[in-house]
Regions:
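Active-site-adjacent "subsite" loops/lids of carbohydrate-active enzymes
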Residues: 1-8, 67, 78, 83-137, ...
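Aromatic- and glycine-enriched glycan-recognition loops and surfaces
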Residues: 3-21, 48-72, 176-187
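Polysaccharide-binding and catalytic clefts of secreted carbohydrate-active enzymes
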Residues: 7, 24, 95, 101-247, ...
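Aromatic-lined carbohydrate-binding/catalytic grooves of carbohydrate-active enzymes
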Residues: 21-57, 250
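Substrate-binding cleft of secreted/luminal carbohydrate-active enzymes
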Residues: 25, 236-262, 272-404
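Structural preference for beta-strand elements that scaffold enzyme active sites
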Residues: 25-27, 73-79, 113, 141-144, ...
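Active-site beta-loop-alpha junctions enriched in small/polar residues
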Residues: 31-33, 81-85, 147-150, 206-208, ...
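Conserved aromatic anchor
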Residues: 419-421
């Protein structure tokens, strides 16, 4: 009971901090590795929540998060990793609802983990059903996917049989894999529209789409001006397809570089702003509070030997080993600092990035996303800086103007007392 209350108290503290910063939405991770931070009919309780995967925590964290967030006028988007299963092979052996026992054919194994196979219709149906249960049973405001699709290093032999059997359009293997991901995203979007069309669906992919002019020409767009094609070529992620097919409501690319770096934040943010205006979609730039280091600073830091990158964030040393695949990739593509050295960044970098977003978006930029909340709330002075500069006033959730909605009617049950609405 004490641990439950401690978890609830910590979440309330975080939500109060979000409210104090005049932010309006929280992405609450509900499924990290085919597990659940809510009462699921399909998958076990998450080991990030309890000591042993599958152990009942004694309460429903998602239900609690939704109730407390809504009390504060904050939206909750349920954050899913659609495919990721294990961070280490056979990690869940001996635990409840183990797919290695029930559906071993669903898994693609890599040296550093496993995922559900995006090529299998049964997998797409299963993931959609998992998300549908959350949409039906919880008063969430949105659904968001993280940056995990295929894992890097998918060899031909891993899916050759399916490629030969289920490729009626005779696509290249890479295009076929991207199509598999696109099918899931379109299927989830259709499900949400049929259940609760007001629930927003977004994805947070890598910050760079594709720099290949030939591929960009297929979509009638310009290529991303800087960066590499790692996400498009290696993990088979094609955000342009989702935007053009209108199978998402918003895109939140992880632009984890600083202004003036070799992959300049300004250039990438401007490009995404142009893309969403062209096709009709919201752009909520994802900013990294955990990975803004000298690895992404201008080249005055110089290149050095490889090694573990570390940086100092207001006195807290953070290792690159703790970063997500996209965070690690962005670090690899930029200038490293020497082993053991540290660098720091100021909150003003995030403020300036928000101002860049507003400069290039004709509506003042619908929004920004910060990864992760703890870094923002626990960095001394960060919340007050945001509130004193770019978030002086509370903001409404941006309207999705391209979707038909019913007239909500006149507002009722509202009062203004002592300066509070």
């Amino acid at each position: 009971a004490q641990e439950i209350q401690e978890q609830k108290d910590e979440l309330i503290m975080l939500l109060d901090s979000v409210k104090a910063a005049n932010a309006n939405t929280v992405y609450f991770q509900v499924r990290g590795r085919c597990d659940a931070m809510y009462k699921s009919s399909y998958e076990p309780w998450s080991s990030d929540l309890v000591a042993t995967r599958g152990m009942d925590p004694g309460y429903d964290p998602l239900l609690f998060a939704v109730e407390e967030a809504h009390k504060r006028g904050i939206e909750i988007h349920a954050w899913f990793n659609p495919y990721r299963y294990e961070s280490v092979l056979h990690q869940w052996d001996g635990t409840p609802q183990n797919y290695r026992e029930s559906h071993p054919e669903w898994l693609l194994d890599y040296s550093d983990g496993s995922i559900l196979n995006p090529a299998m219709p049964e997998v797409r149906d299963h993931i959609t059903a998992i998300i549908q249960e959350v949409v039906q049973n919880y008063d969430i405001d949105g659904v968001v996917f993280d940056d995990y699709f295929y894992m890097s290093g998918t060899t031909d032999d891993m899916d050759d049989e399916l490629y030969q059997q289920s490729n009626p359009d005779n696509l290249s293997r890479a295009d076929w894999r991207r199509q598999n991901v696109n099918k899931l995203i379109a299927q989830v979007y259709r499900m949400i529209q049929s259940e609760k069309p007001y629930v927003r669906f977004g994805i947070s992919p890598a910050g760079v789409w594709c720099t290949d002019a030939t591929i960009a020409e297929r979509y009638g767009v310009t290529p991303t001006p800087v960066g590499s094609d790692w996400a498009y070529d290696d993990i088979f992620c094609d955000p342009m397809a989702w935007i053009q097919e209108h199978s998402i409501d918003y895109i939140s690319p992880q632009i984890y570089w600083t202004i003036g770096s070799s992959s300049d934040y300004t250039l990438i943010a401007e490009w995404w702003s142009q893309i969403v205006r062209q096709f009709g979609c919201h752009f909520y730039s994802s900013h990294s509070a955990s990975d803004l280091s000298s690895a992404k600073m201008p080249s005055k830091y110089g290149k050095t030997t490889t090694g573990t990158l570390s940086f100092d964030l207001n006195g807290e040393k953070v290792s690159s080993k703790a970063l997500s695949p996209i965070e690690r990739k962005t670090a690899e593509e930029n200038e490293y600092i020497v082993d053991g050295a540290t660098a720091s960044f100021k909150g003003s970098e995030l403020v300036n990035q928000i101002k860049v977003n507003r400069t290039y978006d004709e509506t003042g930029a619908p929004g920004s996303v910060f990864y992760n909340m703890r870094k923002v709330t626990h960095t001394s002075g960060m919340l007050s800086l945001l509130r004193s500069d770019v978030y002086k006033y509370p903001a409404l959730i941006p309207a999705i103007s391209w979707k038909a909605t019913s007239d909500p009617g006149l507002v009722s049950n509202i009062a203004f007392t002592n300066g509070q609405l």
